[in-house]
From Swiss-Prot:
SUPFAM superfamilies: Chaperone J-domain, DnaJ/Hsp40 cysteine-rich domain, HSP40/DnaJ peptide-binding domain
UniProt record, GO biological process: chaperone cofactor-dependent protein refolding; DNA replication; protein refolding; response to heat
Binding sites annotated in the UniProt record for Zn(2+) 2: C161, C164, C184, C187
Function noted in UniProt: Participates actively in the response to hyperosmotic and heat shock by preventing the aggregation of stress-denatured proteins and by disaggregating proteins, also in an autonomous, DnaK-independent fashion. Unfolded proteins bind initially to DnaJ; upon interaction with the DnaJ-bound protein, DnaK hydrolyzes its bound ATP, resulting in the formation of a stable complex. GrpE releases ADP from DnaK; ATP binding to DnaK triggers the release of the substrate protein, thus completing the reaction cycle.
UniProt similarity note: Belongs to the DnaJ family.
Protein name, as recorded: Chaperone protein DnaJ
Organism, as annotated: Chelativorans sp. (strain BNC1)
Underlying gene: dnaJ
SMART domains, per database record: DnaJ
Length: 374
């Protein structure tokens, strides 16, 4: 299990950007592979520190992590963190560029894919049985309709950055034989700046609003299923493609039924007389129909009755599971004097044939201890 990112960097959850940067620099210097050659534990720690800082230094990724933890980044969710070449080099050069140098070509700036979003939805077992179409409202970042996502005021366009001349990188001499190359501080590596920002989105190219979406929940869907809605995540930056929306489904526990795959289980109490003499009872299945279950005489507590085809539908398949009814024989309570007399009389006239399991059990137990004591 991954360690908490805040604990990895030894900072509080309220740490600001300056504290995060300071903590990262200290720990990265301590565990850098060049300072710990051959130390696999140090290398592993160094990767964990990098991943934690790459996530927490980005406001959007940090917000997603604070809300969902590591689950926000599983299978494409949220940040694209980890020990990858591009993300790590940007972080390391931004902080250690003045002492480490390097001439790595920055990956192309400009268009950026929008972040993936997560939406938690709880449905009932009945809704899982029938399927449903749900209307949800999702707060998200959408492309600004005023500037069409460019961030520039309508009628104007982003211009080439005068500091890096569109390269996104700047180079400076260290005073010796080497020079260092760093992300351009003016355009943040994009190669362009916005002189006249859009007034509606303040130059961001995106706006935050709540969107209404229709989600199809197919019949037979199981607890923990994830539904991906491609392109329904946050809008991309500067014309980049949108992210995806992931619906995480949970099924509310049912009062009467438990589910195991496509099968359903239900426990039904029956009276002692029904179990002894036989009888029947009715159960209402998930499809709303009444089904009568016959109880043969001498039924024991725990016996199961199988109702074929009365379980859950199999997702996107024609098959249907079964419903298993387990009876629990209820011992009478609060007996009247007459009821007690009748039971006492029944006890007197009963034989081992009426209770073969208990009679046989105690006989075997007696034989065991007699043999054991010899």
């Amino acid at each position: 299990m991954k360690a908490d990112f805040y604990e990895t960097l030894c900072v509080s959850r309220n740490a600001d950007e300056k504290e995060l940067k300071s903590a990262f620099r200290k720990l990265a210097m301590q565990y850098h592979p060049d300072r710990n050659p051959g130390d696999m534990e140090a290398e592993k720690k160094f990767k964990e520190i990098n991943e934690a800082y790459e996530t927490l230094r980005d406001p959007q990724k940090r917000a997603a992590y604070d809300r969902f933890g590591h689950a926000a980044f599983e299978q494409g969710m949220g940040a694209r963190g980890g020990f990858n070449g591009g993300g790590f080099a940007d972080i390391f050069e931004d902080i250690f560029g003045d002492i480490m140098g390097g001439a790595r070509q920055r990956r192309s700036g400009g268009r950026e894919r929008g972040a993936d979003l997560r939406y938690n939805m709880e449905i009932t077992l009945e809704e899982s049985f029938t399927g449903k179409t749900a209307q949800i409202r999702v707060p998200t970042a959408v492309t600004c309709d005023e500037c069409a996502g460019s961030g520039a005021r309508p009628g104007s366009s982003p211009v080439q950055c005068p500091m890096c001349h569109g390269a996104g990188r700047v180079r400076a001499s260290t005073g010796g034989f080497f020079s260092i190359e760093r992300t351009c501080p003016q355009c943040q590596g994009r190669g362009q700046i916005i002189d006249d920002p859009c007034r509606k989105c303040s130059g961001q190219g995106r706006l935050t609003e709540e969107r209404s979406l229709s989600v199809n929940i197919p019949a037979g869907i199981e607890d923990g299923t994830r539904i991906r809605l491609a392109g329904e995540g946050e809008a991309g930056l500067r014309g980049g493609p949108p992210g995806d929306l992931y619906i995480f489904l949970s099924i509310k526990p049912h009062e009467f039924f438990q589910r195991d795959g496509a099968d359903l289980y239900c426990k039904v109490p029956i009276s002692m007389t029904t179990a002894a003499l036989g009888g029947s009872f009715e159960v209402t299945t998930l499809d709303g129909t009444q089904t009568r279950v016959k109880v043969p005489e001498g039924t024991q507590s725990g016996r199961q009755f199988r109702l074929r085809g009365k379980g859950m539908p199999v997702l996107r398949q024609p098959q249907v599971g079964d419903l298993y009814i387990q009876v629990a024989v209820e011992t009478p309570q609060n007996l009247t004097r007459r009821q007690r007399e009748l039971l006492e009389e029944f006890e007197k006239i009963s034989s081992g044939e009426n209770s073969p399991q208990s009679t046989g059990f105690f006989a075997r137990m007696k034989d065991f201890f007699e043999t054991f004591g010899e």
